[in-house]
């Protein structure tokens, strides 16, 4: 039986999974959500001996019901292969009494590889299924990691083109160089003069621009998205939470049915939403702990029920979380207001016009599955330093935010449930911040000179992704003002 997807702002608009992947965003600007959240047909015990690829198949077939087994397995095989430097794909590492789900073993050393390795294959399969003749233009805003992972995934994929926008001063040097050296005849990257929220809003506006869509169609193009607003990004992320639980079970760390807590460093709310979907699938997750940095708009939302983006935007050492408009929260809002598309639309309009909204007490009660915390810049650095001193384990800044919040939550609540932390990036990606936290003397060193030092202290070999950029040629130098994004896209495409 097919699982259909509908726009959260208009329940009458129903599409198949492959159509939702192609569209990215519904024509009314709403995000696609499953008509009903699926349940896994198998127990955790039955899945515990499966490898990552087979686990991903069991999870994704529940959501992508119009894909045949052959189509889905083919996408999975092409995605999760030797591009990953660990055959477990997402290894679970125990450090003291906490488990780190390392999601950074892919081609661009960030968790975005977990979904963006497969999205191009899901997209091209969807295009064939729906007899799409237009070239698909992937339009993406990035706070650092999505951009490179999407460019690497879509580079030279037939029938596609990708244009990435990133905030000029809002990414690390390594992240910027990763993007600006990306090869591929169908790849463009643009630095905007503004922050990530400007980039994301600009991309959304282009998706909703019907006149632009017509101009593109006349030239044989159509837009889609590689951001987590696309369900083709979100669904593959559900798989690794299922995999984490089954590995704990297989390793004898937990008993079947024993609940775990999951801590996720959160910016755009996609990664933690995937964990929420995993819980609904049947994974015994007790608490979903949302970890924020100094841009703590989500922490405040979970505390008060008011989402308010009217605040100073802080540039932190965990830039992938420097976000004040968390797009995927809209999907959760839709669920907690009883799938009321009118109410969801009303709240999103309020956010657009006033920059804030407040949920009802009844809706807030439905957030009991979540806990939230935040980590200041000092606490994040301490988290890296102390974990390294005690255990020798080196983590990146985003993972450190989650580790701090995990400790904070345990201390406040007394909850000793076993915790899995989503470890979202390699420390090599944020080498300056990581090495400065380990030893303050590194604060004035050149970022690239610190790479061999990190290898020395961590004992983890320098990833290929880093070696590749050290002597790579810069191929992209486009820049634009935030209000000129549409003109830039038209210029690139010759529209």
What are these regions (language model features)?
Residues 1-495:
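PLP-dependent amino-acid enzyme catalytic core
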